[in-house]
């Protein structure tokens, strides 16, 4: 006698933390799914009657007909209204726009004669089958999966994620996935596909080798209100489902400590999201496409990398780094360029001014005019060395206008005091006001030229934003505006001397590590 195939049922599995199992009728009746309590989908783009499903237990397949307006996807086939597709066991139905995945599963039943047909969504209840029928639910509860919403950070933990002592970290866009449309930026939530076919196999190997798989992705458009967080969450769940391995996903939604290349996401992983298990930097790796590669870095790759943030993220941590092509395709390492400014090279010591032979302070009344980018260290230096020695501090940010600055300077000089002008003063015209004040009072006027470059000043401003909530952010428009307006000071303007002030790192040790991190790619 031929072997009788074990009877069973087809059911749909939601992503970790999603809806409970959805059992499909085995008698040929249609089941309509869409937005609602059965799927726990609230996406308004998903119709309440999005798809019609008819299960065939004999072939273990499901016929899928799209009823809604927006596209559903069966496996890799995108449907249209009225069109049909099919699912086999292990295939995934994306309800709408490539989101809200439901994977078809088969569950064998050992005593079918005692098991009457039950409505969709009702678990099997025979004594012999209770344990098997509850497996999907138990698996989800045990893994404690789902999303955690923190300030400026989203964290997703899929079922099956375990704490490990080594991490295989990945960027998302351009590393694990790319756009299906071929455009640089996705046209919608369903515009994605796995970047290379080699990726799923490699990820399975890493999981088998004991790596924790983690995605670190910057998504500033969420913080700016241009990308709904719930839409991106659904996309992440769909991507993780497609990759077929348990991932933890950290999403930086704003600028600051969490945004790569700053290491805040990694710090959160180590301190709060790995159950206290220490992570070995040397045994871990990070893979990303923002690697600072120049134009024509490989045959057919004409565009240079848009950023170096992924490579710098790894560099900040001391992690081994690879690009997707090097890691998944075994391409030879490509050349790359690091930013012109390296914060690790900033000195804490050295001469306060150049030339060193010049005195920093004057015993007699004078005017000192500072010149330098916002963030060049002017206020810190002047307060530490001049204001503390009795100089009157004149600053437009506190006084409100250059007219008040001039008045304050004139008043101080009439009182026989020394004055430090703490403004950017980029051109001769802005400096001439204070040269004239000194000339009218019959005292010398010196210029302190703060030599921090544009890139160093931008780094300093980002550091201030991360460490001082009272600091008003300085936009790049202001920074580049200063550079455009800048005129190098000369003695011909009326200065008695021009001293160069190199930037020195004046931060407490606990902040030194953060300052020395690359903060922009």
From Swiss-Prot:
ATP binds at residues 372-379. Residues 127-137 have a biased composition (Basic and acidic residues). Residues 341-516 are annotated as: Kinase. One of its GO terms (biological process) is positive regulation of double-strand break repair via nonhomologous end joining. The modification Phosphoserine is found at residue 114. The modification N-acetylmethionine is found at residue 1. Residues 146-337 are annotated as: Phosphatase. Residues 109-143 are annotated as: Disordered. Monomer. Interacts (via FHA domain) with XRCC4; mainly interacts with XRCC4 phosphorylated by CK2 but is also able to interact at much lower level with unphosphorylated PNKP. Plays a key role in the repair of DNA damage, functioning as part of both the non-homologous end-joining (NHEJ) and base excision repair (BER) pathways. Through its two catalytic activities, PNK ensures that DNA termini are compatible with extension and ligation by either removing 3'-phosphates from, or by phosphorylating 5'-hydroxyl groups on, the ribose sugar of the DNA backbone. This is Bifunctional polynucleotide phosphatase/kinase. It comes from Homo sapiens (Human). The lineage of its organism: Eukaryota, Metazoa, Chordata, Craniata, Vertebrata.
